[in-house]
Regions:
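N-terminal amphipathic/basic-hydrophobic helices that include classical n-h-c signal peptides
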Residues: 1-21
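Acidic, surface-exposed loops and disordered segments
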Residues: 16-169
Length: 169
């Protein structure tokens, strides 16, 4: 393929712009961490909206967008949610807000992957805003009493059986 001088300029300008963005994104990836202890400060409504919008525009197989997000802010509910599995969920009790990630298993056979992508996108958006987050796995986990973590969360929020509960962010 032969490139004319104008095309070379356009391509090189695009590449320079893209490299700058990718360096910023790479830095975001390097700096992102899972946080299990949180500050007492309130979250800005605009930040929460941005995080949820990011998840809502995340890619999904065949654009099924079968995921849904349950935002939890009530302290008592967060405390109860922190008991959804035997180990690793207690940090939920100390956060200001949690997002339960669920997906309609009848819409896509790859609902786990779709919901996982949305979850990671939420984490990256939170990190970009300077906010900490942590993925709390729910699917295929159990409470201290041996109850399925999915069933525990499903019962807490009245989630229909057709929805799989993947995680809490």
């Amino acid at each position: 393929m032969l490139l004319l001088p104008r095309e070379i300029f356009v391509i090189s300008s695009y590449v320079k712009f893209r490299i700058k963005i990718m360096k910023d994104f790479h830095q975001l990836l390097l700096n992102r961490r899972s946080y299990r202890k949180y500050k007492e400060q309130e979250l800005k409504a605009e930040d929460v909206k941005l995080i949820l919008e990011a998840a809502l525009v995340s890619p999904s197989s065949k654009s099924t967008m079968g995921w849904e997000f349950i935002v939890v802010e009530d302290k008592e509910t967060l405390e109860k949610l922190s008991l959804c599995k035997e180990h690793g969920a207690r940090p939920i009790a100390g956060c200001k807000l949690a997002v339960v990630v669920v997906a309609d298993t009848t819409k896509s056979d790859v609902w786990v992957e779709d919901a996982s992508i949305a979850s990671v996108i939420m984490q990256l958006q939170a990190a970009d805003l300077g906010l900490g987050s942590c993925w709390i796995q729910v699917r295929q986990r159990f409470t201290a009493d041996g109850v399925s973590s999915e069933d525990y969360v499903r019962e807490m929020f009245g989630i229909p059986e057709q929805f799989g509960v993947l995680s809490v962010m």
